[in-house]
Amino acid sequence: RLLTVTGVQTCALPIYALDARWKTLQREAHPDKFSAQGTAAQRVAMQWSVRINEAYQRLKDPLRRAAYLCEIAGAPIDAENNTAMPAEFLMQQMQWREALDDATTIDSLEALHQEVMQARASALDQCQQLIDVTHDFGQAAQQVRALMFVERFMKDIEARLDQFDVT
């Protein structure tokens, strides 16, 4: 029910609509609303509240939301076992890794971070199109797996940036 804030399950989910739906569902399932019905009803409400929060955390992240939509459409991500990537993507990853290894200044790291963030945004847009427009969940799952690599690489860049003392 949380994902269908607009009446349809979609990857292009406005965060304000998701937030509003989450708050509504939290109010409906709040354990205090069930105090007159006893502890068993409150316990069930608490379980629903936890599930609503877990769903919200998953859906507010665009990559996790895309992965979920692929999975419910029958295209599992299976990132642990399916690591095949297009050659072009692997070449880009190697170039970025080399750039990270060669980066010695904050400016060079920030430039690389900006480039990777732009590539991530573009890949998320493409993933959204694959899910919402063409309904090509197999290709979208491939895109999600690629984005998982990009996310990990962004964390590597951020870790290197953290090594610089910017006081």
Per-segment meaning from a language model:
Residues 30, 60, 64, 76, ...:
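Short alpha-helix boundary/capping elements
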Residues 95-167:
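Accessory regions outside conserved functional cores
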Residues 14-29, 43-67:
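J-domain helical core
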Residues 11-13, 150:
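Generic detector of short, aliphatic-rich beta-strand segments that form the cores of beta-sheets
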Residues 16, 39-43, 47, 80-83, ...:
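Short, solvent-exposed segments of well-ordered alpha helices
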Residues 64-114, 118:
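Conserved, surface-exposed functional patches that form binding/active-site neighborhoods
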Residues 30-32, 38:
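Proline-aspartate-enriched helix->loop->beta-strand connector
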Residues 1-11:
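Single conserved hydrophobic/aromatic residue that forms the stacking wall/gate
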